[in-house]
Amino acid sequence: MQTVLVKNRTWIWAVAAMVAASACGPKNVSKTTGQAYNNPKWGGFANPSYRGQETGPGLVLVEGGSFTMGSTEKDLQFDNNNAERTVTVNSFYMDEVEVSNLQYREYVYWLMRTYISYPEVYQRALPDSLCWRSKLAFNEPFVEYYFRHPSYKDYPVVGVNWQQASEFAQWRTERVNETILDREGIIKYDVVTDANDDNTFHTRTYLAGQYDFIKKGKKPLSDFSKKKKKDQKRFKVNMEDGIFLPEYRLPTEAEWEYAAQANIGDVNFNNVEQKKIYGWNDYTIRIKEEKEKDRGKIRLNAMVGKGDFGGVAGGPLNDAGFVPTPVYSYWPNAYGLYNMEGN
């Protein structure tokens, strides 16, 4: 979390005694030394052009800000573990939808195909399908079919613990950055032949220069530390080039609650006008103000009454959410995120 106060930082200011340096100077000239960037004559310090971070696949930008985090109800049991407080969250990217069975099956398939000599890696990543079992409930069809059957491919994956989810996020980091390098023509990567056991792409290992099995692509970068142009082809990307995406990870508690509240649609002159129970401006889970044909429909997948998980068969108000619904069900919130309530 970033606070207003700046601590443990040293700011260096260069002060000219007589004449202040003009802000209008050559774009690729250092304002510290006056030497040219990207010039072998001056050592070849690189200042690559950077147009901003690209949005990773399936992500949505969540604009940061301050919000009130914690429970609004009185702490009758005095647990003191969720008191209301003001928290500031930096801008971040978040998945548009929950991770689906199809996406997670892609992950475990990659592990099975890649770590041939280490089958336990694949076994360790499989979700716990036994989480469906419950006393006095017949959920065996979900135990057998929910994760594997194509009918459920767009449903959110369940039975994944924190460790498995963190490893999935790390795997996704490597695959996205690997794809970017191949797309930009910097490397020529064949997943089938090049990825096996220990020979798999990892961003940090790549940055450390530990890979010798990756083939060079057709569009190298420039190495300005070499004077001769024929020697200036560079096939290794550095973090300073701005090509790699940051690491994927699980959202923090504050980030998740901030994204779920979605107060961005209720701001008036730097103030949030009202607290919301849900991600929309209403106190009910049913649609009331839309067209008559939509009026009364449920906005989220939730149990609407004791034992009522899906509504009445054939009725217009049936949400059909007997189990988690597909990840693109219902309307997104103000940030464009789906199923931040219910499901």
Which residues are covered by each model-predicted region?
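Bacterial N-terminal signal peptides that target proteins for export
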Residues: Q2-I12
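Basic K/R-rich, polyanion-interacting modules in nucleoproteins and related proteins
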Residues: W42-Y50
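Functional-site microenvironments in short loops/helix caps that host divalent-cation chemistry
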Residues: K27-K41, L61-V62, T68, E73, ...
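C-terminal motif of bacterial Sec signal peptides marking the signal peptidase cleavage site
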Residues: A21-A23
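Short, flexible, solvent-exposed loop/turn segments with mixed acidic/basic and small polar residues
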Residues: R9, F78-R85, Y145-F147, K236-N238
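Sec-dependent N-terminal signal peptides
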Residues: I12-M18
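A short glycine-rich, aromatic-capped structural motif
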Residues: R51-F142, K153-N177, G342
